[in-house]
Amino acid sequence: MEKVDILRRADIFYDLSGAQLEMLASICEERIVKLGDIIFEENSQGDEMFVIARGAVEILVDPSIVGGPGAKKRGSLPVTIATLRSGQTFGEIVLVDQGLRTASARCAETETQLLAIPRNKFMKLCDTYPEMGYRVMRNIAAELAFKIRGSDLAIREQLLWRPRPAA
């Protein structure tokens, strides 16, 4: 499948023109990862986001990194919080800031094809074509807001269903 077709399926690029998708495709790097391969680790420095062309990727968090009561009981095994499939994106927050990764990403199928979008090349493209940069950043903001709302809901659910100590 062509890079432009892969990008077109991703929500954050839905409103880009054909020419804008071509420009974006020109900076993408194709990667093939195998089952169990770590794409990036939680708390590592990030410099690229990814679009899943084919396959699946698990997003994991390590409860022991957060600490707090019960962290040792939970152990240090990562917990899968999402499984993403073809057409979905991950790691987009590095296009917004240069902070550390908030989760790990691991290949979840025998073979997964990714498009990597390097932050430095993306930012140069945005500087040259600000309308395109605005559209993508607006869509990334909407995607991140959606993910935050989902996390908020999950936290509320856990708080409501957590057993309370006997009085």
For the regions a protein language model found, what residue spans apply to each?
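Cytosolic regulatory regions built on CNB/CRP/Popeye-like sensor folds
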Residues: 1-167
